[in-house]
Amino acid sequence: MAAMSLLHRASVSAVAALSGRRLGTRLGFGGFLTRDFPKTVAPVRHSGDHGKRLFIIKPSGFYDKRFLKLLRFYILLTGIPVAIGITLINVFIGEAELAEIPEGYVPEHWEYFKHPISRWIARTFFDGPEKNYERTMAILQIEAEKAELRLKELEVRRLMRARGDGPWFHYPTIDKELIDHSPKATPDN
């Protein structure tokens, strides 16, 4: 790069010297060697006098910047309305206050939460503790019945072996004399 810029500068100054000679000189190259070189026509630029800049190959940051911009956009797209909604709920509805339960009234499971958003989440997405308790008790009952049936099956197998009354005595075995072991001429013989 530097050699090309020096060559370019020398050629420009040579052309300027040859084309701009005076009329008084009759020889072809008369004033070329005696005259000063003109000022540089195309200056070499080295980017702020810090030497020659190198072209550093680095990965593109386009996709990273695009991802971060989209991430910021979608976080703000959902974050701003959520923040506004929570603020409005806290200002206009507020937290629940502890009060005496009336006689004969059974509160729902979501009524024990203080904040209205927690109450809505508990009412909409979660089951009540009674339902969870009944579900767990049903699972425990099914597993207990399975364990009891496994124990009964082991006891039945032990008694069948001890008494010799299993299904293996109900089928007569084939007499070995009926099997033909002679060489066959065809597969169907």
From Swiss-Prot:
Keyword annotations from UniProtKB, A to Z: Electron transport, Membrane, Mitochondrion, Mitochondrion inner membrane, Respiratory chain, Transit peptide, Transmembrane, Transmembrane helix, Transport
Domain of life: Eukaryota
Membrane topology: Single-pass membrane protein
Localization terms from the record: Mitochondrion inner membrane
Transmembrane segments: 73-93
A GO cellular-component term linked to this record: nucleoplasm
Span of chain positions assigned to the transit peptide in the UniProt entry: 1-46
Main location: mitochondrion
Stated role: Accessory subunit of the mitochondrial membrane respiratory chain NADH dehydrogenase (Complex I), that is believed not to be involved in catalysis. Complex I functions in the transfer of electrons from NADH to the respiratory chain. The immediate electron acceptor for the enzyme is believed to be ubiquinone.
Assembly description: Complex I is composed of 45 different subunits.
Family the UniProt entry places it in: Belongs to the complex I NDUFB5 subunit family.
Protein name (Swiss-Prot/TrEMBL): NADH dehydrogenase [ubiquinone] 1 beta subcomplex subunit 5, mitochondrial
Species in which this protein is naturally found: Bos taurus
Gene: NDUFB5
